[in-house]
């Protein structure tokens, strides 16, 4: 590796504080939020603020949170949820989605909903407690065999075995050994991501530039990994 021999300075040559432009999709992705707590609500807010993506459905067992979230982000303050826009559990949505796909394949309407326009989901945001991530992710993947992108809030799970379980489920999704058509292959090629947002925080991006890209600080000799949990997490919710 060629060392940087220029005069040391820690002045950034890039600007990381500028907000990204509003993202406009030619075909806006349709999003399901699982969990209408503070994290799920935060995602919904920034989805609406930063892009033209559409929040089309919510899974939340608490009736008040479900209604509050839906009226703000989906069916409007004076509206009521249409069939497919509100669920009390992710399992109910999986059942609905399985029925929707079958009706699409056969050309028949949804069970008991003749003529109803189905709510279609392209991506799912998993915003439940850490220890529930595995159950939700594997339940969706095994129940549907793929077909939707999934974003999981950090951490991925609470144990290595749990993470491996999700990996194995995702790896095997749709791999039935048969030949796939172009459309079928495209349907299976979805994204699975973990929302490690601090990788993109301005201070971390600046540090990465100074240490790795420009080598202005010096070599990394050791790393102390900490999780600075803010005090507000202690006042209203669980703490890892």
Model-derived regions: residue spans:
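N-terminal Rossmann-like dinucleotide-binding module
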Residues: 2-81, 114
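Acidic-histidine catalytic/liganding microenvironments
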Residues: 50, 73, 173, 201, ...
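Conserved acidic residues
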Residues: 56, 84, 122, 221
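Receiver (REC) domain switch-region micro-motif
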Residues: 58, 124, 150, 223
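A structured beta-alpha segment of the ubiquitous adenosine-cofactor-binding alpha/beta core
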Residues: 83-120
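Beta-strand-loop-alpha-helix segment that lines the small-molecule cofactor/substrate pocket
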Residues: 119-123, 129-199
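Glycine-rich, N-terminal phosphate-binding loop of Rossmann-like dinucleotide-binding domains
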Residues: 127-128, 227
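Predominantly a Rossmann-like dinucleotide-binding segment in NAD(P)-dependent oxidoreductases
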Residues: 190, 198-240
